[in-house]
């Protein structure tokens, strides 16, 4: 088959980008012809298809802001360049990932009109929530926009800005559920939780497929699964990730905690962790992540938003490291309590503190956790299910 894989960014910027790049490589390995459609960016990977990428847009005051504000609604440049790609490549399938704002769903409409089958992997809740993360103002879990998109304006959910929230509302009103559903042949939800939310948002259940993300298993393989006496966190240092709750619990405990990542709360957390056995390590590359997470007794994923299918859980388990996760979003689906980790109530520092102690006291079969996870999240397993979706269209 000939497949166009599309994502707004084409470099390892976040989980959606990593999944897109992994998907491209997997399809090529399986003998499919693959083209890429993304936005121009100085950090993009090299590809012969970049000649069709629309220009980079930046949502900041200055030159190009008008084009940036128009882009979410489907601009002439995006339409023209994507049409040229279709003319040259003649795909069977367009596989969308994270395309809103910088590319827009106009490419799904163009492909659909040409008879190209459209598959869309959903990495966030943008089709339900104009903010994409189901967080009112980035702080409080909220589902009001599932049924009434005007709520994004009422609560000023976009940067607490009336203008930004109005634009998000207009974008949602252009790309309505009925419009997107009409041009999409299959949606892929990486978690059952997301699929349930899509049903709650009145999307056609017959078009929803649940398929957990995969990772490059080879990079997680180890010779030994020996552990050291510390636990860890890996991820963005921002409020919705629950890192503040983790620090609150960890400060009251005698166990060393290693934190990998950066973000808006970094300096605040450094001040809060001063004098404790909490170490903020900043950003790390994979070899260091593999070493730190792989030797940790367990990894904590204390999220306070609707995590979909977090790579932090998947990668930790593939390294033989159990996970202590919050009971929210798609996290519980990935953890077999007592066997591959434990769960706690999201945002509950008291319960988290107790669970940390229990995790240190519980003997886990680290090697078995790794072997089972490497099977569950393998490219082979993912591809077998993806191919069934492709061939059913």
Predicted regions and their residues:
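A charged, aromatic-enriched C-terminal amphipathic alpha-helix characteristic of glycosyltransferases
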Residues: 361-391
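Donor nucleotide-sugar binding/catalytic pocket of nucleotide-sugar-dependent glycosyltransferases
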Residues: 127, 146-220
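Short hydrophobic beta-strand element within catalytic cores of glycosyltransferases
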Residues: 322-325
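Conserved donor-binding/catalytic core segment of Leloir-type glycosyltransferases
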Residues: 188, 219, 223-254
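N-terminal strand-loop element at the rim of the active site
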Residues: 7, 11-13, 25-76, 80-89
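Nucleotide-activated donor-binding/catalytic signature segment of Leloir-type glycosyltransferases, i.e.
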Residues: 267-291
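Conserved acidic donor-binding segment of nucleotide-sugar-dependent glycosyltransferases
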Residues: 337-338, 342-349, 357-363
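Short acidic/histidine- and often glycine-rich active-site loop of Leloir-type glycosyltransferases
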Residues: 313-314, 328-338, 342-343
């Amino acid at each position: 088959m000939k497949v166009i894989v599309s994502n707004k960014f084409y470099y390892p910027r976040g989980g959606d980008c990593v999944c897109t790049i992994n998907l491209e490589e997997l399809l090529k390995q399986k003998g499919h012809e693959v083209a890429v459609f993304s936005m121009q960016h100085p950090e993009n990977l090299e590809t012969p298809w970049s000649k069709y990428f629309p220009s980079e847009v930046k949502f900041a005051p200055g030159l190009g802001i008008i084009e940036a504000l128009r882009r979410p609604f489907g601009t002439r440049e995006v339409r023209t360049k994507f049409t040229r790609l279709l003319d040259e490549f003649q795909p069977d399938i367009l596989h969308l990932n994270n395309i809103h704002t910088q590319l827009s769903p106009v490419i799904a409409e163009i492909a659909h009109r040409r008879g190209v089958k459209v598959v869309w992997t959903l990495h966030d809740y943008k089709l339900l929530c104009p903010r994409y993360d189901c967080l009112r103002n980035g702080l409080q879990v909220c589902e009001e926009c599932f049924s009434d998109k005007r709520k994004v304006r009422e609560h000023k959910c976009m940067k607490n800005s009336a203008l930004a929230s109005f634009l998000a509302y207009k974008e949602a009103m252009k790309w309505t559920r009925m419009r997107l559903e009409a041009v999409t042949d299959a949606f892929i939800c990486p978690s059952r939780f997301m699929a349930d939310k899509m049903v709650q948002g009145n999307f056609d259940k017959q078009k929803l497929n649940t398929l957990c993300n995969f990772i490059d298993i080879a990079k997680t393989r180890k010779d030994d699964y020996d552990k050291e006496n510390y636990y860890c966190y890996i991820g963005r240092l921002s409020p919705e990730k629950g890192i503040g709750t983790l620090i609150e619990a960890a400060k009251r405990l005698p166990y060393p905690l290693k934190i990998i990542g950066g973000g808006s709360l970094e300096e605040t957390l450094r001040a809060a962790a001063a004098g404790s056995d909490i170490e903020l390590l900043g950003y790390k590359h994979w070899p260091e992540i593999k070493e730190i997470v792989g030797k940790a007794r367990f990894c904590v994923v204390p999220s306070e938003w609707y995590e979909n299918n977090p790579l932090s859980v998947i990668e930790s388990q593939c390294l033989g490291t159990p996970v202590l996760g919050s009971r929210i979003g798609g996290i519980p689906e990935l953890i077999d309590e007592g066997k591959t980790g434990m769960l706690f109530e999201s945002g509950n520092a008291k319960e988290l503190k107790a669970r940390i102690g229990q995790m240190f006291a519980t003997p886990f079969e680290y090697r078995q956790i790794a072997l089972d996870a490497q099977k569950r999240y393998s490219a082979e397993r993912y591809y077998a299910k993806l191919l069934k979706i492709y061939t059913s269209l």
